[in-house]
Regions:
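Acidic catalytic/metal-coordinating carboxylates
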Residues: 36-39, 62-65
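Receiver (REC) domain active-site loop signature in two-component systems and cognate sites
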Residues: 58
């Protein structure tokens, strides 16, 4: 069973991603959510996350900076970057 973290500042997008994951049939133990990279980094420091979906553009800390900072962590999740940015 996998633990998933969704990092997205727009609530509707977070809910959509969560719904798609739940309908995928992949065995998921926990789906966690947060709305910025700072909070995500704190979660990643405290909990082993298997898969992370992250937006690129977010307030406080964007997805690019989050991915750069998490490289120093002991466990680095499989990361999927998502964005509506043109």
């Amino acid at each position: 069973m996998k633990t998933v973290l969704i990092v997205e500042d727009e609530k509707m997008i977070r809910q959509g991603i969560k719904t798609m994951i739940m309908r995928s049939g992949v065995p998921i133990e926990t789906i966690m959510e947060c709305n910025n990279g700072e909070t995500a980094l704190e979660i990643l420091k405290e909990q082993e996350i298997d898969v992370m979906f992250t937006d690129i553009r977010m307030p406080k800390m964007d997805g690019i900076e989050l991915v750069q900072k998490m490289q120093s962590l002991e466990h680095i999740p499989l990361t999927v970057a998502i964005s509506g940015y043109d």
